């Protein structure tokens, strides 16, 4: 696309929204055209550039239903409570949608799949490029260990403000590994007299601490040896940069199936 890609940030007043505005403002081929959040947010109405610490950009934080600014791509880092209206607005505007919110209900994911038939939609439980590369490594390990009676445990760490557990990324790791190894059992934390660990099970463990932006460790344990894959984000910019790359990728793409980070990274 020869002109700048017009971007709308949904959840613009939040921590991720501010980083998206700050980093997106520095991208030569992107333009922050709209910034949306709920009217109840204390920073509603503020200049989004000033809120993001990059100076006034003339784009105030507004409601998605009140702001009719035309945009090429919407990046959503809000909450599942906003998803239904978000999808409706994206369809109404014929805007591409990068959906980065976690914790969506099954019916909301189905609504995204239906929307993808009309507009370009990209969804990933993590916008981090290194997380998605680590998923590929985990799949490779799972495939190699599928018949070796390996135990699989997933440990994820996030900041104290994260509202869902385990993380969508941890669950995606688990789904990919389960498919490769034929595992259909799961346990979320353990306590008490649990007995011997069954092989046909993936264990999930969620840690909520401080301002940790995200860390995932995948353990494949055999008798006498263990593989440990760990991917860490050192700050939120890892997710913001990934989401902006997704927006650049999605602009101008045809509708059809939901795109993922694998498409962006050519995996």
Task: Label the predicted regions.
Residues 133-149, 165:
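Rossmann-like NAD(P)H-binding beta-loop-alpha module
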Residues 14-15, 81, 128:
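Residue-level detector of alpha-helix initiation sites
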Residues 6-67, 149-267:
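C-terminal substrate-binding/catalytic lobe of Rossmann-fold NAD(P)-dependent oxidoreductases
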Residues 65-73, 77-100, 111:
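Rossmann-fold NAD(P) dinucleotide-binding segment
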Residues 10, 77-78, 100-101, 124, ...:
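Structural motif
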Residues 84-88, 101-123, 132, 137-139:
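Rossmann-fold NAD(P)-binding glycine/threonine-rich loop
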């Amino acid at each position: 696309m020869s002109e700048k890609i017009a971007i709308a940030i949904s959840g613009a007043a939040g921590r991720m929204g501010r980083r998206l505005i700050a980093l997106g403002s520095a991208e030569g081929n992107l333009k922050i055209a709209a910034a949306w959040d709920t009217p109840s947010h204390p920073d509603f109405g503020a200049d989004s550039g000033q809120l993001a610490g990059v100076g006034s950009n003339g784009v105030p934080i507004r409601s998605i239903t009140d702001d009719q600014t035309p945009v090429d791509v919407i990046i959503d880092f809000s909450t599942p409570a906003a998803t239904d209206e978000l999808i409706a607005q994206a369809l109404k505007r014929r805007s591409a949608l990068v959906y980065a919110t976690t914790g969506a209900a099954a019916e909301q994911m189905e609504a995204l799949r239906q929307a993808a038939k009309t507009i370009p939609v990209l969804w990933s439980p993590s916008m981090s490029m290194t997380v998605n590369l680590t998923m590929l490594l985990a799949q490779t390990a799972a495939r190699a260990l599928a018949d070796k009676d390996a135990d699989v445990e997933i440990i994820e760490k996030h900041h104290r403000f994260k509202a869902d557990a385990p993380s969508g990324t941890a669950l995606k790791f688990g789904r990919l590994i389960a498919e490769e190894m034929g595992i259909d059992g799961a346990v979320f934390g353990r306590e008490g007299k649990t007995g011997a660990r069954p092989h046909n099970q993936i264990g999930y463990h969620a840690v909520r601490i401080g301002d940790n932006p995200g860390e995932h460790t995948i353990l494949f344990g055999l008798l006498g040896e263990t593989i440990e894959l760990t991917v860490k984000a050192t700050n939120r910019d890892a997710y913001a940069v990934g989401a902006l790359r997704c927006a650049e990728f999605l602009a101008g793409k045809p509708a059809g199936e939901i795109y993922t980070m694998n498409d962006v990274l050519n995996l």
